[in-house]
């Protein structure tokens, strides 16, 4: 389970969650994308659905769906190997329900332990850009790592450190119950070549290297991903066309990486054990 988290909205979590899921699916992995942004569902609306299940995140968390039949909960996207669980809480009832439930913060973690979800190679969980019980239960559902997303703007990074890291600090007591706080892989999204972005990136690296992000840095691990996602129109085009961005741009004459290269490098950093599959997909791209 790989949550994609930032307590600040507008950082690009949903877009990159969907793009990563699409790349992994095209590489032959069986992927489930869960739209955990109950207020503004975006991740699972990027790709068209071939089948929309009658239930979604709401019923999964409220424990009112029979998981023995996958079609009750699992929707199928137009992308082969990519299934989704839709966000379906338009009245915003889940936060209050999970806040008041004794097991609210670990309910998603427990739900995803069902045999139904063991059939997937990767489960990516998008989240809302806010500090809430919903973000907490998504973080606690992780099986080891999560992706943090921030733009190369110091105020945005400070908000990530102030909001997301503080949220993780508040979850540290769960370690007493055997629930480990996930290591955070910070992804810089919407990178640019201007001097301000470059300076901001250098400052971000320094903060992380010096472990100045938390007084509990010995218990909360953050590292900066080498892959940078540049601020390119092709990512908007992918959203509009409803296809994974790596399909739209395999090669480029720009200085920055192509969309395919960016997704390839990101996937290799996060899932080195499947690099052969990613290499095979890259070879297919070269022959296209």
Indicate where each model-derived feature is located.
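P-loop NTP-binding core
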Residues: 1-288
């Amino acid at each position: 389970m790989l949550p994609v988290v930032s307590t600040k909205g507008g950082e690009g979590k949903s877009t990159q969650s969907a793009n990563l899921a699409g790349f992994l699916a095209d590489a032959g992995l069986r992927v489930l994308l869960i739209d955990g942004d109950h207020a503004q569902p975006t991740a699972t609306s990027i790709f068209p659905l071939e089948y929309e299940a009658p239930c979604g995140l709401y019923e999964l968390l409220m424990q009112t769906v029979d998981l023995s039949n996958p079609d009750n909960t699992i929707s199928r996207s137009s992308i082969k190997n990519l299934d989704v669980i839709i966000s379906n809480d338009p009245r915003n009832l889940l936060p209050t329900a999970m806040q008041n439930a004794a097991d609210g913060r670990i309910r998603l973690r427990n739900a995803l332990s069902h045999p139904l979800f063991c059939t997937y190679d990767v489960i990516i969980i998008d989240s809302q850009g806010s500090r809430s019980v919903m973000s907490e239960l998504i973080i606690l559902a992780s099986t080891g790592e999560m992706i943090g997303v921030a733009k190369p703007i110091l105020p945005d990074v400070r908000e990530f450190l102030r909001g997301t890291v503080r949220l993780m600090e508040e979850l540290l007591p769960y370690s007493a119950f055997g629930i480990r706080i996930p290591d955070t892989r910070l992804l810089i999204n919407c990178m640019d070549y201007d001097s301000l972005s470059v300076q901001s990136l250098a400052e971000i690296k320094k903060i992380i290297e010096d472990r100045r992000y938390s007084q509990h840095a010995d218990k909360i691990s953050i590292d900066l991903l080498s892959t940078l996602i540049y601020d390119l129109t092709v990512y908007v085009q992918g959203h509009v066309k409803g296809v994974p961005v790596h399909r739209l741009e395999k090669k480029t004459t720009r200085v920055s990486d192509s969309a395919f290269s960016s997704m390839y490098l990101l996937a290799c950093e996060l899932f080195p054990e499947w690099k052969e599959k990613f290499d095979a997909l890259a070879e297919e791209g070269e022959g296209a």
